[in-house]
């Protein structure tokens, strides 16, 4: 089986052009950075998710984007009672958890998304200034692989996902794509269509030479015999969080 990951195309003259997603997708919105709320709103309009689930503090992003989730999950340490009442009055269900729990709010929201049996889950606001939270959310990608559901982290600038088989990236020439071995060694790695190609390579933790590669012609092929690769793909060539976008 071959997986295809499509990048969002950014054109200065006409804004963002994106493919219409035909698979069943569920959005999970967490409380980290996601960039311009308009990007989330546009993606909700084009991807037509089957449901939007909020992890506690992610409600502020949804409020800014004008989106009402079907469900809010968490310990409510970032969502005051007034906002909880606001969402409940609009038909949103809230599942409240104690603060003393083993799961993060984002993980709880992801589990609710899995119950809907989607083909894909897009987790918004999963990255940001809290490195520990970002690492926790990256680790959640493994649960998607275990269930056969494609899970990715996404914001205005990039998406992050795991690769465990031949994968075709459809995007735009010049897009930065970084690849890292995840949870051990990745063997038999072959990259085609990238500025820096590889043939039957072994990638190991502690040797991050897969950082800052680039798509050459808008299409790259990633193959591996064993292990997992963590992919980080930036949508706009040369544009990264915290940098000017003129």
Enumerate the language-model features and the residues they cover.
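Hydrophobic alpha-helical signal peptides and transmembrane signal-/tail-anchor segments
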Residues: 1-9
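Short, Lys/Arg-enriched N-terminal segments with co-localized hydrophobic residues
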Residues: 9-21
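N-terminal beta-strand-loop-alpha-helix module at the start
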Residues: 22-87
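General beta-strand structural signal in soluble alpha/beta enzymes
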Residues: 29, 53-56, 74, 95-96, ...
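Short phosphate-binding loop-to-helix
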Residues: 94-116
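Short Gly/Thr/Asp-enriched flexible loops that form oxyanion-binding sites at enzyme active sites
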Residues: 132-142
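Short, acidic/small-residue loops that bind anionic groups at enzyme active sites
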Residues: 143-159
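Long, charged alpha-helical interface segments
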Residues: 158, 163-246
């Amino acid at each position: 089986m071959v997986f295809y990951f499509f990048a969002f195309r950014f054109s200065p003259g006409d804004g963002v052009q994106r493919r219409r997603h035909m698979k069943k997708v569920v959005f999970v919105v967490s409380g980290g950075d996601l960039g311009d709320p308009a990007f989330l709103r546009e993606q909700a309009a084009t991807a037509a998710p089957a449901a939007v689930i909020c992890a506690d503090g992610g409600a502020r992003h949804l409020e800014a984007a004008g989106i009402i989730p079907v469900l809010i999950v968490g310990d409510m340490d970032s969502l005051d009672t007034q906002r909880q009442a606001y969402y409940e009055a609009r038909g949103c269900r809230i599942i409240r958890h104690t603060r003393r729990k083993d799961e993060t709010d984002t993980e709880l929201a992801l589990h609710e998304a899995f119950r809907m049996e989607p083909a894909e889950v897009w987790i918004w606001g999963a990255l940001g200034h809290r490195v520990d939270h970002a690492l926790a959310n990256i680790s959640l990608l493994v649960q998607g692989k275990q269930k056969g559901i494609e899970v990715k982290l996404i914001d205005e600038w990039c998406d992050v996902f795991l690769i465990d088989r031949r994968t075709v990236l459809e995007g735009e020439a010049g897009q930065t794509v970084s690849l890292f071995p995840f949870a051990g060694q990745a063997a038999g790695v072959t990259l085609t269509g990238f500025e820096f190609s590889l043939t039957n390579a072994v990638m190991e933790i502690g040797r991050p030479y897969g950082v800052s590669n680039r798509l050459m012609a808008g299409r790259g092929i990633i193959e591996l015999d064993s292990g997992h690769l963590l992919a980080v793909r930036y949508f706009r060539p040369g544009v990264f969080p915290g940098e000017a976008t003129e």
